[in-house]
C-alpha cells in the first residue's frame, strides 16, 4: 500500500447542495421551496436557522470556485435548485436561473474543474407540494423529467457527470418516517414506499431522456449507504415513539 498512487484521472473534489449554500432564496425569480417553508416551523432546525442567505454562494460563486482551484480540486458537485429553473415546478422557465448555473459551470471549466450536477438535492418547489403533494403523487414523474430535460438541453454540452436524486433513501426516510425533513411526517410507512416508487420511476425515465440528449455523459442515482446513519435513525424513531407514548 505504501507504493500505491491514485490514478491521474481520479476526480478529487468537493460537493454542495443548492439550499445549503446558495442563499438568495427569493432573488431573480426563484420560487419558494419545501425547505424554505419547513425551516420556518419553530424547532425544526438548530436555533431556527434558515438557508435564506447561507454562505451566499449565489453571489460569491466565482470566489468559491477560485478557492477550489487553489486547493487543487478537480471536480465540483453541486445541485441545481428546481425552483430557480421553474419557479412553480411545472410552468414557465426562469431564464435568470439558467443564466446563474451556466455562469457557475463556465467558471468551473475556466479553472479546469469538472462540473458534476445533481438534479435534485431535496429542495422541491413548494407549488408542487401544494398542487398535488409532491413526490407523494405520480404526477411528480412527468414534471421531474421535464425539468431534467431542460437542464440536459441547456448544459449537456458542458456537463458530463450527472446525478438524478441525491440520497433518495435519506430524504424519504427523514421526510416520512422521522419527521426531520419536509414534509415532516412521522411513521407514514405506506406513503414512504409510495414516494420511493415515484422517485425510482422519475430516475428511470430521466435516464432514458439523458441517453438521448447527452449520449456521451454519465449518470447515476446517489444513495447513502452507512450503517451508523441507519442506527441513528432507528434510535431517533424509538425516541420519538417513546415521547409520543408519554
Go through each PLM region and give its residues.
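Non-catalytic scaffold segments within catalytic domains of secreted glycoside hydrolases
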Residues: 1-65, 69-74, 85-246
